[in-house]
């Protein structure tokens, strides 16, 4: 395993540990989730470049689309919670039910 892949896996692991550590705050969780998605994007891009397969070249773009959708939904939820309660605690998500 090359050092590049090890660094990307280390970035993913650190983001995952941050997600587990700061799971009570929505903003920190969203930032850690973005770090995980960015490391996955870089990993799939490197794999697509190394395999030279035309079928796998679309995978990084699909992952980037899902990351953008996740960021938009997370930001909308963060704004909604911040405007309503003034805090970004995840335990406030139960209070958003109809």
UniProtKB/Swiss-Prot annotation:
Annotated GO biological processes are:
ATP synthesis coupled electron transport
Gene Ontology annotations for the cellular component aspect, listed alphabetically: mitochondrial inner membrane; respiratory chain complex I
Q: Which InterPro entries match?
A: NADH_UbQ_OxRdtase_chain4L/K, NUOK/Mnh_C1-like
Q: From the record, give the transmembrane residue ranges.
A: 1-21, 29-49, 61-81
Membrane topology, as annotated:
Multi-pass membrane protein
> Where the protein is mainly located, per its record?
mitochondrion
User: Which keywords, in A-to-Z order, does the entry hold?
Assistant: Electron transport, Membrane, Mitochondrion, Mitochondrion inner membrane, NAD, Respiratory chain, Translocase, Transmembrane, Transmembrane helix, Transport, Ubiquinone
> Where is the protein situated, by its record's location annotation?
Mitochondrion inner membrane
Enzyme Commission number, as recorded = 7.1.1.2
Please give the catalytic activity noted in the UniProt record: a ubiquinone + NADH + 5 H(+)(in) = a ubiquinol + NAD(+) + 4 H(+)(out)
Gene3D superfamilies, A to Z: 1.10.287.3510
Quote one Gene Ontology molecular function term.
NADH dehydrogenase (ubiquinone) activity
Alphabetical list of Pfam families matching this protein: Oxidored_q2 (PF00420)
Provide the function of this protein. Core subunit of the mitochondrial membrane respiratory chain NADH dehydrogenase (Complex I) which catalyzes electron transfer from NADH through the respiratory chain, using ubiquinone as an electron acceptor. Part of the enzyme membrane arm which is embedded in the lipid bilayer and involved in proton translocation.
Q: How does it assemble?
A: Core subunit of respiratory chain NADH dehydrogenase (Complex I) which is composed of 45 different subunits.
**Family, as annotated:** Belongs to the complex I subunit 4L family.
Q: What is this protein called?
A: NADH-ubiquinone oxidoreductase chain 4L
**Protein encoded by which gene:** MT-ND4L
């Amino acid at each position: 395993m090359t050092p590049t892949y090890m660094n990307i896996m280390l970035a993913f692991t650190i983001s995952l540990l941050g997600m587990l550590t700061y799971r009570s705050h929505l903003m920190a969780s969203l930032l850690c989730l973005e770090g995980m998605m960015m490391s996955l994007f870089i990993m799939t891009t490197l794999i697509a470049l190394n395999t030279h397969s035309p079928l796998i070249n679309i995978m990084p773009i699909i992952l980037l689309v899902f990351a953008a959708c996740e960021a938009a939904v997370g930001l909308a939820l963060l704004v909604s919670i911040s405007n309503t309660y003034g805090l970004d605690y995840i335990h406030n998500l139960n209070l958003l039910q109809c």
